[in-house]
A protein has these predicted regions:
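Short Lys/Arg-rich basic patches
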Residues: 1-32, 42, 83-89, 96-99
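Short coil/turn linker and secondary-structure boundary residues
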Residues: 1-2, 47, 67-70
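Residue-level signal for the start and early helices of compact helical domains
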Residues: 10-12, 21, 25, 40, ...
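Short amphipathic alpha-helical segments
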Residues: 28-30, 38, 46-58
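Short, positively charged interaction helices/loops
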Residues: 60-99
Length: 99
């Protein structure tokens, strides 16, 4: 998991206490503009998309916010840039466009 300014340093572990895990390759479908925002974050923070997603999920599982106030501001800018208007209330209410 990423241990920089993107993710709050709320974990008791430090950078020197890395946890060994087994990762698997997976394919997921995700909303196009959301992926653009996520890719912009990983590019800016110099991390992988997998690291970002793991950090978001681990924080969510503990009811914690995964982003610093500064990163949240940056995310808002990326959302505007890529026209992402989806909100949390839209979760589980998305319908895929027919091609």
């Amino acid at each position: 998991m990423y241990h920089g300014t993107l993710v709050h340093m709320t974990q008791e572990k430090t950078e020197h206490q890395l946890v060994e895990v087994e990762r698997v390759q997976t394919g997921v479908r995700i909303e196009k503009r959301m992926l653009k925002v996520l890719k912009a974050i990983v590019e800016q923070k110099d991390i992988t998309l997998g690291d970002l997603l793991e950090g978001i999920v681990l924080h969510a599982f503990e009811g914690k916010t995964p982003f610093s106030p500064q990163t949240l501001k940056e995310i808002e800018q990326f959302k505007q840039l890529y026209g992402m208007t989806l909100k949390a209330a839209d979760s589980h209410h998305l319908k895929e466009r027919k091609r």
